[in-house]
Amino acid sequence: MSRRRKANPTKLSENAKKLAKEVENSQEENDCDMLAKPQTPTIIIPGHMDDTPNPAGSPHDASIKSSSSTISDHTSTSATTGISDFPDILAQTEHGCSVLIDGNHLREIINSVDTQDGKQDLLSDVIRQLTSIKERLTNDESPVKDDLKEDPDDMSPMLHAGNFDSEMLLRQHELMQHQQQQMIIANMLKATQSLPLLFNGGLNYEAILNNPVLNATIAGHLPNPLASNISLLQKSISAKLAAAGNMQTVEKVETPLNLSKDTPSPTAIPQSPLSGFRLPYSLGTNYGSDGQLFNNCSPNSSGKSTPGNTSVTSEVATPRPQAKSPNHIKRPMNAFMVWARDERRKILKAYPDMHNSNISKILGSRWKGMSNSEKQPYYEEQSRLSKLHMEQHPDYRYRPRPKRTCVIDGKKVRVNEYKTIMKTKKDLMWGDEPGFSQPSDLQMDLASHVNLLNDLTQHHHQSHLLQTAE
C-alpha cells in the first residue's frame, strides 16, 4: 500500500479529490429532502478528502495522521488508512449508524478500472442508481386521500375550489341584512326629493288602505290569496313605518349588498324624516314579488283593463294550484344533480343557515372547475338513471310548465314582458319631464305598485257603487 502511494502520489491524490467531490455534490442535491424527513435514513459521507493535503508538499506522517483522525471521527470500518483510502458510506438512522458501502471494497472496484473516465462513469452510474431509488421513494410516499370528513373545519377548503369566490359568499352570508335595510332607507330618502307629490300629501294612502268599503269589497270579491296579501300589506305598513321612524338614516351607502339575517338594533332619533308621510307599500325585502302582486296572472286569466290605465286584469281567475299531482313523474337526474346531491348535504351540514341560492352558486362554480375525467362517473350514472327511468315509465313525455301570462288591453302578455313594458314606459315618462333625474329601480317599483293599488281601489269603488245603485 505504501509503495503504490510513493510511486504515484499526485495521481492518487487527484483521483481521491475528484471522487470525494462527486460524492459530495450528489449529497448536496439531496440535503433539503433529508432535512425535511428526519426519520428517513441519511447517508453520511466524510468530507476529509477535500482537506487532505498534497503529499508532494506536506510530510507523509502529517497526511496519515489527518486521514486516520478523520476516519475515526466517522466510525469508519476500513482496515487501512491513507491518502488513497475511501471513506465508508454510512446511513444515519434513529437507531444509529450502519455501513452501506465499505470504503476498501469501493476502492478495489474503482481501482479495477484502468482509465480515469471509466472511474468517473462508474461513480456516476452509482449516483444515478441512488437518485432513482430516491425518486421512487418520493413517488411512493404520496399521501393517500382519505374520505372527506363531514366537519365544518374541513369544509372551508372545499368551498374555495372553482372560479367563483366562495369566501366572499360566506362573508356576505355571515354579515346578513344590515346594509340592505340601510340601502332601502337611503333610497327612500332620495325618493322624497325626486317624488315630492307622492310623499307630501298628493295621494292619501291612509284613506285608501283604511277604507272600510274597500276592505269589505276586497274580502267579498277577491280570491283568498290576493285578499290575504292585501290585508298583510295593510298590517305591515304601520309596523314598518314605526320601525323606520327609529332607524338611523344613511346618506350614502357604498358597501355591497349583504345577505345577512341579523337585524340592526334601532337607534332613537328625535325627528325622523320618514315620520311625515305614509308609504304605500311594505319595507320588507319581498315587495314587488311575483307571488304577491301577480297571483291573479295565470294561463287562464281573462278580463278587461281599467279605462285610462294600463294594468293587470281586474277579473281574476282561480290561481293555478301549487301542489303537484300524486301521479306526477319526476325527470331523471342529470350528471350535475347526481354530483350536487351529496355535496349540497355536506355544505348544509357545515353551514345550516346558508341560503340555497349561495349553495347553488358554489356548486355550479365547482362543477365548472372540474375536469372531464372527474365528471365522467357522474355522466355514466346519468345514463344509467335515464335508461332505468325509460324502463319504468315507457310512456313518459316531458311537458314543460306553461309560462305565466297577464291580459293587458285584451292581449296575453308574459309577466316578464309586462315588467319590461312598464319599465320602458316609466323611463320615457321620466325622460320627458324637465328637472327630474333618472329614477332608480326602487322608485320605478314604487310607482308601479302605486298604479296597481290605484287600479284596485278605483275598480272596487266602481263595483260598490254599481251594487248600491242596483
From Swiss-Prot:
It is found in: Nucleus. One of its GO terms (molecular function) is RNA polymerase II cis-regulatory region sequence-specific DNA binding. Disruption phenotype: Hermaphrodites have an egg laying defective phenotype and a reduced brood size. They display a protruding vulva phenotype and there is a failure of anchor cells to fuse to uterine seam cells (anchor cell-block). Animals also have defective vulval morphogenesis and gonad migration with increased pi cell divisions, which thus leads to an improper uterine-vulval connection. Defective response to CO(2) sensing. Residues 294-316 have a biased composition (Polar residues). It comes from the Eukaryota. The keyword Metal-binding does not apply. Residues 60-79 have a biased composition (Low complexity). InterPro entries: HMG_box_dom, HMG_box_dom_sf, SOX/SOX-like_TF. Residues 14-24 have a biased composition (Basic and acidic residues). One of its GO terms (cellular component) is nucleus. Keywords: Differentiation, DNA-binding, Nucleus, Transcription, Transcription regulation. GO terms for biological process: anatomical structure morphogenesis; asymmetric neuroblast division; cell fate commitment; cell fate specification; neuron fate determination; regulation of DNA-templated transcription; regulation of transcription by RNA polymerase II; vulval development. Residues 1-79, 294-328 are annotated as: Disordered. Expressed in body wall muscle and head and tail neurons. Specifically expressed in O(2) and CO(2)-sensing neurons, including BAG and URX sensory neurons. Residues 329-397 bind DNA. Probable transcription factor that is required for uterine and neuronal cell fate decisions. Controls genes required for the specification and differentiation of O(2) and CO(2)-sensing neurons and for maintaining URX sensory neuronal cell fate. This is Transcription factor egl-13. It comes from Caenorhabditis elegans.
